[in-house]
């Protein structure tokens, strides 16, 4: 299900648009205020959310009209939303349990349940401000007893049909490995946190979750790797790129395969990936095989001899600073290069230009966090920079993925050679 996050000033307009198409979910209704802030504070800044409302719709990504898909004033959020009735039933069960523990009457205002969340089977991932009232804080401080907390979260787990529950917190900006260092497990066995390079046994013992987006299976170990559901629209856009079929692609920040898999599904001959987090590489490997795509992992210092058609995905477990040397030895170049690193991918720009195919209609997709007032100006600067580095004429198309914080957006600049 797709929900529209829009400015309050445009709420009536977009609600009418959705209602006229019989896509508005009346049983859920428009969401705003503290509930909206509580649910999405791990994706957007609170000050930004206070100016917005969320309009729930019955749209799927596949049937979104192009005018909505391309509208820069809408932030599209993909999720499963529970019905209000389910929330009420769960709330009653939780209040009854807390009341029995405290031996007193309690209220929903004191002990609200997380009403919106994301499920990645078998994990329920809650927003940062879940259980944020002073009463909840005092309850967890006073009843640190494992049995009491387990009894409480048993109720949630049964209601949501999950075996694990955790609170999601933002990825530290300076962590280049993009690890969920602040993930807070609440319920279920997440395994022992491993420092250093993991072994095959460590991979086998770890807790893994999964989901499907655009028909593509993805998996990851939530203690060690992140998953960004906010990129689903950009992943869908990649599926429709021109000049992918039977081409060589480079993904210099592969992660668990966010964009890699879209290129493969779109018909790329081989996608060459770089990733420094071994847990992300293992996640990418597992999901590729589940999707039926051949994959080969190359560690730093190992040789790789490229043969056309051998593997759909080749992952180098090393820094992308070695990408130019690898491509030179293989005597190949890339038609599309994905630079999916935030807040900026600038450190890899030079590498990208060195491995790009020197023909018309070659592309570098540059991901950046940009202040809203600077988006167009920065587009010209990025295009000029790449044109100089490539010594070729280029054009730049600007694509807004989502709001990153107030007045800052995740932008993808498509640089194309002409």
From Swiss-Prot:
SUPFAM superfamilies: S-adenosyl-L-methionine-dependent methyltransferases. Gene3D superfamilies: Vaccinia Virus protein VP39 (3.40.50.150). GO terms for biological process: tRNA methylation; wybutosine biosynthetic process. Keywords: Cytoplasm, Nucleus, S-adenosyl-L-methionine, Transferase, tRNA processing. It is found in: Cytoplasm; Nucleus. Pathway: tRNA modification; wybutosine-tRNA(Phe) biosynthesis. It is an enzyme of class 2 (transferase). Its EC number is 2.5.1.114. S-adenosyl-L-methionine binds at residues 228, 235, 275-276, 302-303. GO terms for molecular function: S-adenosylmethionine-dependent methyltransferase activity; tRNA 4-demethylwyosine alpha-amino-alpha-carboxypropyltransferase activity; tRNA methyltransferase activity. PROSITE patterns: SAM_MT_TRM5_TYW2. It catalyses: 4-demethylwyosine(37) in tRNA(Phe) + S-adenosyl-L-methionine = 4-demethyl-7-[(3S)-3-amino-3-carboxypropyl]wyosine(37) in tRNA(Phe) + S-methyl-5'-thioadenosine + H(+). It comes from the Eukaryota. GO terms for cellular component: cytoplasm; cytosol; nucleus. Belongs to the class I-like SAM-binding methyltransferase superfamily. TRM5/TYW2 family. S-adenosyl-L-methionine-dependent transferase that acts as a component of the wybutosine biosynthesis pathway. Wybutosine is a hyper modified guanosine with a tricyclic base found at the 3'-position adjacent to the anticodon of eukaryotic phenylalanine tRNA. This is tRNA wybutosine-synthesizing protein 2. The lineage of its organism: Eukaryota, Fungi, Dikarya, Ascomycota, Taphrinomycotina.
């Amino acid at each position: 299900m797709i929900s529209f996050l829009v400015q309050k000033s445009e709420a009536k307009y977009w609600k009418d648009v959705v209602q006229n198409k019989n896509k508005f979910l009346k049983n859920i209704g428009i969401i705003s205020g503290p509930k909206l802030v509580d649910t999405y504070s791990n994706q957007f800044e609170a000050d930004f959310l206070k100016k917005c409302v969320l309009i729930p719709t019955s749209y799927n990504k596949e049937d979104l009209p192009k005018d909505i898909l391309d509208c820069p004033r809408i932030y599209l959020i993909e999720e499963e939303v529970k019905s209000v009735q389910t929330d009420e039933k769960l709330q009653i069960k939780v209040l009854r349990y807390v009341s029995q523990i405290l031996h007193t009457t309690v209220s929903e205002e004191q002990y609200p349940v997380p009403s919106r969340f994301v499920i990645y089977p078998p994990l329920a991932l809650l927003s940062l401000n879940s259980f944020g009232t002073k009463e909840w804080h005092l309850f967890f401080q006073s009843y640190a007893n494992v049995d009491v907390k387990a009894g409480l979260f048993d109720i949630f787990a049964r209601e949501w049909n999950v075996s694990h529950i955790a609170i999601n917190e933002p990825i530290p900006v300076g962590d280049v490995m993009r690890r969920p260092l602040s993930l807070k497990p609440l319920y279920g066995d997440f395994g022992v946190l491993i420092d250093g390079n993991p072994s095959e046994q460590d991979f086998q013992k770890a807790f893994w979750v999964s989901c499907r987006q655009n028909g593509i299976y993805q998996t990851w170990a939530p203690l060690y790797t992140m998953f960004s559901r906010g990129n689903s629209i950009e992943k869908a856009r990649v599926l429709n790129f021109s000049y992918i079929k039977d081409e060589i692609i480079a993904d210099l920040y592969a992660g668990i395969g966010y964009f890699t898999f879209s290129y493969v599904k779109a018909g790329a001959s081989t996608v060459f990936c770089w990733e420094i987090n071994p847990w992300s590489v293992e996640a990418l490997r597992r999901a590729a095989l589940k999707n039926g795509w051949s994959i080969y992992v190359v560690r730093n210092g190992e040789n790789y001899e490229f043969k056309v058609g051998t593997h759909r995905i080749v992952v180098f477990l090393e820094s992308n600073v070695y990408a130019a040397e690898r491509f030179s030895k293989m005597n190949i170049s890339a038609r599309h290069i994905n630079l999916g690193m935030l807040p900026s991918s600038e450190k890899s720009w030079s590498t990208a230009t060195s491995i790009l195919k020197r023909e018309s209609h070659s592309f570098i997709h540059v991901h950046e966090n940009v202040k809203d007032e600077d988006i167009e100006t920065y587009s010209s600067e990025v295009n000029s920079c790449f044109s100089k580095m490539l010594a070729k004429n280029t054009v730049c198309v600007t694509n807004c993925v989502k709001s990153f914080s107030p007045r800052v957006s995740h932008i993808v600049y498509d640089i194309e050679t002409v």
